[in-house]
């Protein structure tokens, strides 16, 4: 006999099968479940979201870009985009926004962010700390591979800090990067040491590194050590090129306090060696300003970080405080949309590629959107995050007179085969304490009547 389920009961069963997610902003993203039931994937405000999957699975077009559009429907929210392909810049750039890039080719007038290092330092709450931080980022890669040259490179870093100290405290002009770096490249050792002596805090540095006494400077002859230090100083100065050595007055401080302005960091792999220190500094500056107790920026900040782990390519760590922002940024109004192809690539964003800090930092992402993973560590980590459950298996006996054997085994809620079978545009959603749900995101054309 065939019994039909009453329509009312069938509707109740379908309602019970729908995931119980909290409501997000703008009604969420249109999707459908395995059975074809329509569902709205929420994009919660203030919740960090991690999106992972191999290339070509639709991480950007199906989720991250539409999610960013929903969050930016709030006119008070500011946004920072990090990307490699200018996808977000082409979609979200508006008149008045700023774009950080090594090259200014093809950009609208006044769109290029022309950073002024001196003005940035003067606007900071602690000038000396800002000077030290800028110097550390510029010399970080040299110091990491210093070897026996450590003392010379450290001396060059301290010399650069001394120059910034003189410009910030002893002059009134906000000299552009082009003017400052151009002058440093042309100065002789004697002229540079005489310039450093204008600030009392540099006197000890001059005696320790160069054997230079400002009170008895007449007849001073630069030592061989001075020449070695200048070599490493000029190596760091060579990083100032392209847009990073332009004449301008832009600062991160001003961006955070300008209403309705978004910032785009387009990382060009062709100029990665030059761009990396500046990109890492800008991201850390944004994070520090937003998390600071003294920050007067009340507007919520959305950071869309698409393939930001590529900053660590080439075996160089790119620690800008990502996991600190993920775990502590919610109270400060900082929200992250992080996209990566592999969770192991995030190790490069932790200090010294520390995998334990990177794994622990995943606690700052209550929502994960997992498209098809491509490596075993990412798969195993996702299965751990998504949880496990006991499944009962019954094994039939060989003889009909024997009893069947029943076993209970602890298995992941999403198996490796289920992850491997995910088609482009299909992903598992895990939000807070809800069970993972498989959805297929609907393209905009599919939502038309």
Question: Which role fits each region the language model picked out?
Answer:
Residues 44:
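Residues immediately N-terminal to the Walker A/P-loop in ABC ATPase nucleotide-binding domains
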Residues 39-41:
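Short, polar loop/linker segments at the starts of domains and inter-domain junctions
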Residues 326-432:
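Conserved ATP-driven motor cores of ASCE-family P-loop NTPases powering translocation/secretion/packaging/pilus
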Residues 2-37, 48-334, 405, 414-449:
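P-loop NTPase motor domains
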């Amino acid at each position: 006999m065939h019994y039909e389920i009453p329509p009312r009961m069938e509707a109740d069963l379908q309602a019970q099968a729908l995931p119980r997610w909290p409501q997000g902003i703008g009604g969420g993203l249109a999707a459908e479940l395995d059975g074809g039931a329509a569902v709205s994937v929420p994009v919660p405000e203030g919740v960090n979201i991690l999106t992972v999957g191999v290339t070509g699975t639709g991480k950007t077009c199906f989720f991250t870009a539409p999610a960013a559009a929903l969050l930016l429907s709030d006119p008070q929210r500011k946004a920072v985009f990090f990307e490699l392909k200018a996808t977000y810049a082409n979609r979200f750039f508006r008149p008045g926004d700023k774009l950080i890039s090594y090259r200014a080719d093809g950009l609208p007038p006044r769109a290029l962010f022309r950073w002024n290092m001196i003005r940035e330092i003067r606007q900071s709450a602690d000038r000396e700390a800002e000077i030290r931080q800028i110097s550390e980022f510029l010399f970080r890669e040299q110091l990491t591979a210093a070897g026996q040259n450590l003392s010379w490179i450290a001396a060059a870093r301290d010399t650069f800090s001394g120059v910034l100290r003189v410009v910030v405290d002893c002059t009134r002009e906000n000299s552009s990067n082009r003017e400052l770096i151009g002058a440093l490249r042309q100065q002789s050792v004697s002229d540079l040491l005489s310039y450093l002596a204008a600030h009392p805090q540099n006197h000890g540095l001059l005696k320790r590194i160069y054997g230079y006494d400002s009170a008895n400077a007449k007849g001073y002859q630069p030592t061989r050590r001075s020449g070695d230090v200048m070599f490493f100083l000029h190596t760091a100065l060579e990083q100032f090129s392209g847009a990073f050595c332009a004449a301008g007055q832009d600062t991160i401080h001003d961006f955070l306090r300008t209403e309705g302005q978004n910032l785009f960091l387009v990382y060009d792999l062709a100029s990665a060696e030059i761009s990396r220190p500046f990109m890492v500094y800008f991201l850390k500056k944004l994070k520090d300003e937003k998390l600071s107790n003294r920050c007067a920026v009340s507007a919520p900040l959305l950071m869309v970080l698409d393939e930001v782990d590529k900053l660590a390519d080439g075996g160089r760590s790119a620690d800008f405080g990502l996991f600190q922002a993920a775990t502590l940024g919610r109270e400060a109004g900082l929200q992250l949309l992080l996209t990566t192809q592999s969770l192991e690539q995030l190790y490069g964003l932790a200090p010294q590629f520390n995998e334990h800090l990177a794994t622990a930092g995943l606690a700052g992402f209550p929502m994960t959107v997992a498209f098809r993973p491509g490596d075993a560590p990412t798969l195993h980590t996702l299965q751990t995050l998504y949880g496990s459950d006991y499944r009962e298996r019954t094994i039939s006996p060989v003889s009909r007179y024997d009893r069947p054997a029943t076993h209970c085994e602890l298995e992941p809620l999403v198996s490796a085969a289920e992850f491997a079978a995910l088609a482009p545009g299909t992903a598992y959603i895990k939000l807070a304490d809800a069970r993972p749900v498989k959805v297929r995101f609907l393209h905009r054309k599919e939502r038309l009547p």
